[in-house]
């Protein structure tokens, strides 16, 4: 009952409150949304929608929840996780991060994560536990463990060294943290190990063998060396090739180097390398700062050795001899080093070229070279005189001598340029602490491969620059002959020096020899001046006139034959008499061009071409046409060219008259008859008889080859009695038979078949007998007629 009344009193109180309460207005959800949007648009309210769109949240609330989440997660949270927890777009999270970092200095953003100082302190405590356990930790391992960048971890842990972390970091390599005990233990091991080393030792091999931490070893080693606790030096820095050189070894090394240099006067770079000195040049320059040294390719030499070489070279130049410096130098020095040393020595002499360098190490004075040239002087005169007698033509002109001089000057110019380049190269490769001037020329034989290499170098420059120019036509001696001659007069000379000296002398010897030949020729032709020359011209004109008239008469005789026979006779005449008269004219002109010919018949077509190349343009045109007409097929063309050539050469040709022609006919017939009397050759008897019978019948001369004899005999058929012609034909048949048997015997060799031997020998004997019997009768056909005609005349 009491409960019921209690309920009644409570309800009465509620009713009373409802009666006195003020009325409140409630807005609908749509109205609320419109009002909030309007406030946001007017920038009177700053709120952010959640991702589901059901709630609004203020930026301050976002920041508060981010701080709360960072605290809940132990001081490290990913911003992606924050976006999922707070349920807003990621851009709003990123916008609030900047405000949080500015307002709270102990919070920082690292790789998309918020990290505060509390987290870093706990991380440092964990690192310290690991460090105390193992003695060292590496930043790289910590980066993998905590998924943080190395620079950030290094900075964070460095700030906590000595406060949270009991250890220190390597100043040279900030990637490792050590404990003091670890460093002290390794320092003791390093000190003990390197104190026991007595020779240069690679640091890298010790690291791999004893398990040292590489960077710690270098730091401790550098500290011990700088403090003087370890006596030695580390060569090569902190590299794989670093070498520790103890002081005891360095002292022994320096003692050996000083002793060797004092005794020998030079230092070889390879020897220093074998001693463990990696940079020999720098070592020598550092150790001998005040000593005058010459640095070569593979060694350096002292001033004493340089002075010794200089004295030997000076003595050779002053005494007019030669010297090879190779025996004066240590055997370990290469030829290249010896050449550099010699070039440096030559700079100490006067700037005028007083010596020539051969084979890189041989210095030859100019006087010695001149003496060698003089050794050939007598031999030159002997050979020149012999040459003038034996050689059918000598074309030693001013142009030849001028060309030799040009080649010599160009060669000298090229040598000077090579010397200049070599001097500059030497100044770059070798150095002397002192002055000097360059003077000597150097002569080298170019080692040319047989195939494949194109001269890419400059020893062939002279030859290539004169490609196409005519070389001297007369040479003195070949190089091997010069070498043999020099070996007889130069004792104990290196073979390579002899070869190079011979090659060097070839051009000046040839030039001198040409001058000697010219001098010999001039002396032999001096007597040909004055009245003698007039007599020579007179004789030439007489001989040319005789041959000219003979050609004219021979031309008349050819016209009795058919065209094909005329062509053969014309060709024979051009190759014989016409060529003789041409050679006479060429020989006459060549005498003015320093040409010597004993027999004009020895002048060939090639020699005529050489003579033409020496003539003046006016004379060359006419003589060239005359030379070319010998290969034509017309006597008239040749006569025309001959007239032009004679006029160009001022040679007067006397044309024959009737009386002169009769004299020539008589003399020609008499000469052939005299030859016919003495000959016993059947073929020649037939040839001479046929030509003489032709002259008797036609009163003209005929110059015919042997192959035209049948045509001459055929022509005589109607010109001589029938019995004489029959005798000629019979004799011709026997001559042909004999020639055929001789040719057949030559073709078969000396061993014909046995069954034919007797028959052939019998035929040959019968033919020979018949020819002998008929020869006198054939001769009488001409000789009897000759006697009667002489009587008539």
UniProtKB/Swiss-Prot annotation:
GO terms for biological process: DNA damage checkpoint signaling; DNA damage response; DNA repair; erythrocyte differentiation; hematopoietic stem cell differentiation; negative regulation of IRE1-mediated unfolded protein response; negative regulation of NF-kappaB transcription factor activity; negative regulation of protein ubiquitination. E3 protein ligase that mediates ufmylation, the covalent attachment of the ubiquitin-like modifier UFM1 to lysine residues on target proteins, and which plays a key role in various processes, such as ribosome recycling, response to DNA damage, interferon response or reticulophagy (also called ER-phagy). Catalyzes ufmylation of many protein, such as CD274/PD-L1, CDK5RAP3, CYB5R3, DDRGK1, EIF6, histone H4, MRE11, P4HB, PDCD1/PD-1, TRIP4, RPN1, RPS20/uS10, RPL10/uL16, RPL26/uL24, SYVN1/HRD1 and TP53/p53. GO terms for molecular function: UFM1 ligase activity. Residues 200-400 are annotated as: Mediates interaction with TRIP4. Belongs to the UFL1 family. It is found in: Endoplasmic reticulum membrane; Cytoplasm, Cytosol; Nucleus; Chromosome. Catalytic component of the UFM1 ribosome E3 ligase (UREL) complex, composed of UFL1, DDRGK1 and CDK5RAP3. Interacts with E2-like enzyme UFC1. Interacts with RELA. Interacts with NBN; promoting recruitment to double-strand breaks following DNA damage. Interacts (when phosphorylated) with YWHAG/14-3-3-gamma; sequestering UFL1 and preventing its association with PDCD1/PD-1 substrate. Residues 407-473 are annotated as: Disordered. Residues 2-212 are annotated as: Required for E3 UFM1-protein ligase activity. GO terms for cellular component: cytoplasm; cytosol; endoplasmic reticulum; endoplasmic reticulum membrane; nucleus; site of double-strand break. Residues 121-250 are annotated as: Involved in CDK5RAP3-binding. It is an enzyme of class 2 (transferase). Ubiquitinated, leading to its degradation by the proteasome. Interaction with CDK5RAP3 protects both proteins against ubiquitination and degradation via the proteasome. Phosphorylation at Thr-536 by AMPK promotes its interaction with YWHAG/14-3-3-gamma, thereby preventing UFL1 association with PDCD1/PD-1 substrate. Its main location: endoplasmic reticulum. Residues 490-684 are annotated as: Mediates interaction with CDK5RAP3. The modification N-acetylalanine is found at residue 2. InterPro entries: Ufl1, Ufl1-like_C, Ufl1_dom, Ufl1_N. This is E3 UFM1-protein ligase 1. Its EC number is 2.3.2.-.
């Amino acid at each position: 009952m009491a409960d019921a009344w209690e309920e009644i009193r409570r309800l009465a109180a509620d009713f009373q409150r409802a009666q006195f309460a003020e009325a409140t207005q409630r807005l609908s959800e749509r109205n609320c949304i419109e009002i909030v949007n309007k406030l946001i648009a007017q920038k009177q309210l700053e709120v952010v929608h959640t991702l589901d769109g059901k709630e609004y949240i203020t930026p301050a609330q976002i920041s508060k929840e981010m701080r709360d989440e960072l605290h809940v997660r132990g001081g490290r949270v990913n911003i992606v996780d924050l976006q999922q927890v707070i349920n807003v777009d990621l851009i709003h999270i990123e916008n609030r991060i900047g405000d949080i970092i500015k307002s709270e200095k102990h919070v920082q953003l690292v790789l998309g994560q918020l990290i505060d100082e509390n987290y870093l302190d706990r991380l440092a405590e964990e690192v310290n536990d690991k460090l105390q356990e193992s003695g060292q930790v590496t930043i790289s391992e910590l980066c993998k463990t905590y998924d943080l960048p190395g620079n950030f971890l290094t900075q964070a842990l460095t700030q906590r060294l000595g406060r949270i972390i009991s250890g220190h970091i390597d100043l040279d390599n900030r990637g490792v943290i050590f404990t003091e005990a670890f460093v002290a233990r390794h320092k003791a091991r390093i000190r003990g190990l390197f104190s026991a080393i007595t020779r240069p030792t690679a640091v890298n091999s010790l690291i791999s063998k004893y398990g040292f931490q590489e960077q710690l070893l270098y730091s401790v080693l550098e500290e011990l060396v700088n403090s003087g606790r370890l006596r030695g030096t580390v060569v090569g820095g902190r590299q794989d090739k670093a070498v520790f050189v103890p002081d005891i070894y360095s002292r022994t090394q320096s003692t050996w180097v000083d002793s060797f240099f004092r005794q020998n006067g030079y230092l070889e770079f390879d020897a220093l390398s074998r001693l463990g000195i990696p940079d020999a040049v720098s070592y020598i320059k550092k150790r001998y700062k005040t000593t005058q040294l010459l640095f070569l390719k593979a060694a350096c030499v002292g001033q004493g050795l340089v002075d010794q070489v200089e004295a030997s070279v000076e003595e050779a130049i002053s005494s007019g001899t030669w010297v090879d410096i190779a025996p004066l130098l240590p055997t370990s020095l290469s030829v290249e080093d010896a050449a550099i040393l010699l070039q440096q020595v030559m700079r100490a002499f006067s700037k005028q070229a007083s010596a020539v360098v051969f084979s890189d190490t041989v210095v030859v004075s100019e006087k010695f070279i001149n003496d060698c040239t003089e050794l050939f002087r007598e031999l030159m005169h002997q050979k020149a005189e012999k040459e003038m007698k034996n050689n059918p033509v000598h074309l030693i002109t001013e142009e030849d001598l001028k060309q030799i001089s040009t080649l010599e000057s160009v060669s000298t110019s090229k040598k000077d340029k090579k010397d200049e380049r070599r001097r500059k190269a030497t100044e770059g490769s070798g150095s002397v602490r002192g002055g000097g001037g360059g003077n000597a020329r150097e002569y080298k034989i170019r080692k040319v491969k047989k195939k494949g290499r194109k001269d890419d170098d400059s020893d062939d420059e002279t030859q290539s620059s004169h490609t196409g120019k005519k070389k001297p036509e007369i040479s003195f001696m070949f190089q091997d002959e010069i070498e043999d001659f020099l070996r007889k007069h130069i004792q104990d000379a290196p073979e390579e020096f002899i070869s190079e000296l011979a090659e060097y002398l070839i051009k000046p010897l040839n030039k001198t020899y040409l001058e000697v030949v010219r001098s010999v020729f001039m002396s032999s032709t001096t007597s040909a001046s004055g009245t003698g020359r007039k007599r020579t011209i007179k004789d030439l004109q007489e001989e040319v006139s005789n041959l000219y008239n003979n050609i004219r008469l021979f031309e008349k005789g050819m016209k009795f034959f058919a065209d094909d026979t005329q062509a053969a006779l014309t060709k024979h005449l051009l190759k014989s008499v016409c060529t003789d008269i041409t050679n006479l004219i060429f020989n006459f002109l060549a005498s003015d061009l320093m040409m010597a010919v004993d027999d004009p018949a020895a002048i060939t077509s090639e020699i005529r071409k050489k003579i033409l190349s020496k003539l003046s343009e006016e004379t060359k045109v006419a003589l060239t046409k005359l030379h070319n007409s010998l290969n034509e097929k017309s006597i008239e063309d040749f006569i025309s060219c001959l007239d032009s050539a004679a006029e160009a050469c001022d040679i007067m040709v006397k044309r024959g008259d009737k009386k002169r022609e009769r004299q020539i006919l008589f003399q020609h017939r008499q000469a052939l008859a005299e030859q016919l009397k003495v000959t016993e050759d059947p073929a020649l008897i037939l040839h001479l008889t046929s030509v003489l019978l032709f002259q008797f019948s036609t009163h003209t001369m005929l110059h015919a080859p042997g192959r035209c004899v049948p045509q001459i005999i055929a022509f005589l058929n109607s010109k001589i009695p029938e019995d004489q012609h029959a005798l000629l034909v019979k004799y011709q048949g026997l001559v042909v038979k004999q020639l055929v048997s001789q040719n057949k015997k030559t073709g078969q060799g000396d061993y014909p078949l046995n069954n034919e031997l007797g028959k052939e020998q019998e035929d040959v004997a019968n033919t020979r007998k018949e020819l002998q019997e008929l020869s006198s009768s054939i001769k009488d056909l001409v000789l009897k007629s000759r006697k009667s005609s002489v009587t008539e005349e």
